[in-house]
A protein has these predicted regions:
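Domain-level recognition of nuclease-like catalytic cores that cleave nucleotide substrates
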Residues: 130-160
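Accessory nucleic acid-recognition modules appended to NTPase machines
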Residues: 1-83, 88-91
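Active-site-adjacent loop/helix micro-motif of nuclease/hydrolase catalytic cores
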Residues: 103-112, 134
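Active-site ExK catalytic segment of metal-dependent nucleases
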Residues: 94-104
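Short, hydrophobic beta-strand segments that form beta-sheet elements in well-ordered domains
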Residues: 121-127
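Arginine/glycine-rich "motif VI" loop of SF2 helicases in the C-terminal RecA-like domain
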Residues: 62-65, 112-121
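Short beta-alpha junction loops
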Residues: 76, 127-132
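Conserved N-terminal glycine/acidic-rich loop preference
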Residues: 84, 90-96, 133-141
Length: 160
């Protein structure tokens, strides 16, 4: 993802599959729903796979057209690999989205991506943070469920 259009840098060897529904993903992967209900902190269940699936599913639902495509970024270097979960394109701008199942940590991949793409003004970190939006430099921290709120990710993208 060196710039727009993102299709120019797509590799057919690297894909990131998403199911149509979180429930279908759980079934195919053999995830027992009762195991999920036993946990107080659902965000850490199955190493964040459910959280990433949920956010991806919501982004696809928000795409609103047949031409909407989901992208992600990965860099594979011998000493340092990095990955951004989703790249969302709105009004000719790229918005990187990182999904974290627990605390946001150092966000190494996001910082690498932003350093390589200084023209990007806003990046999103979706995690189990409190409802209040938190802004740190170019990063906006939002809770998973913000997608359903009219002040959430969709309205944030629409404001650009």
């Amino acid at each position: 993802a060196s710039g727009l259009p993102l299709n120019a840098d797509v590799s057919s060897k690297i894909i990131k599959p998403l199911f149509l529904d979180v429930g279908l993903m759980q079934y195919v992967c053999g995830i027992n729903p009762y195991d999920i209900l036993k946990h107080n902190d659902l965000s850490n269940v199955y190493k964040g796979a459910l959280a990433e699936q949920f956010v991806g599913q919501e982004l696809i639902a928000a795409g609103g057209s047949e031409n909407f495509k989901m992208f992600y970024w990965s860099r594979a270097k011998k000493s340092s690999s990095a990955e951004i979960d989703y790249l969302y394109v709105k009004n000719g701008k790229i918005f990187p989205i990182e999904v974290k199942s627990g605390s946001a940590g150092k966000l190494k991949s996001m910082h690498i991506f932003l350093k390589e793409h200084p023209d990007i003004s806003t990046a999103y970190v979706m995690s189990p943070v409190s409802f209040k939006e938190q802004h740190v430099d170019k990063l906006r921290f939002l809770p998973f469920y913000t997608r359903f709120n009219n002040k959430g990710v969709k309205s944030s993208f629409d404001s650009y």
